[in-house]
């Protein structure tokens, strides 16, 4: 993990989510790549290690649970944050069981995403917010 700009992936099949979240995180100094295609994102995590991944759960193509499992398998230190419009207690429990850092229900405020990503970054850097 680098000590300067942390590398973040945003994956959501709704383009508006990526369009809003990417600049909000870049403004905080993160290096951000966003994807609306889960297959393209899965290919990308095979070649690049991300510090933090923000992913939707319900997507066309590769399901978010499957994606986060593969991401954690490839890079156990990667912190995964789940965003979903289908938030249930069962889904949240399953996400945490699979190593998710945090779980955010849609609709969300950009400040919520920024706060959770900052907390994940602090954990990676060994500091607190």
Descriptions of predicted regions:
Residues 18, 60, 84:
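The feature encodes the CheY-like receiver
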Residues 108-118:
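C-terminal output helix
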Residues 19-27:
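Charged docking surfaces used in two-component/phosphorelay signaling
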Residues 36-37, 63-66:
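Acidic catalytic/metal-coordinating carboxylates
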Residues 53, 57-58:
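The short loop immediately C-terminal to the conserved phospho-acceptor aspartate in CheY-like receiver
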Residues 29-36, 44:
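Short hydrophobic/Thr-rich beta-strand motif most characteristic of the beta2 strand and flanking loop
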Residues 43, 65-77:
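Short amphipathic alpha-helix used as the core "switch/output" element in two-component signaling
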């Amino acid at each position: 993990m680098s000590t300067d700009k942390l590398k973040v992936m945003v994956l959501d099949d709704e383009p508006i989510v990526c369009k809003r979240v990417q600049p909000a995180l870049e403004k905080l100094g993160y290096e951000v790549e966003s994807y609306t295609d889960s297959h393209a994102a899965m290919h990308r995590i095979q070649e690049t290690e991300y510090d933090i991944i923000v992913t939707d759960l319900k997507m066309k193509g590769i399901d978010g649970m499957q994606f986060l499992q593969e991401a954690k398998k490839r890079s156990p230190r990667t912190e995964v944050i789940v965003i979903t419009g289908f938030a249930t207690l069962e889904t949240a429990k399953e996400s945490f069981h699979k190593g998710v850092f945090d779980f955010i229900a849609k609709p969300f405020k950009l400040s919520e995403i920024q706060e959770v990503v900052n907390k994940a970054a602090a954990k990676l850097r060994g500091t607190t917010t």
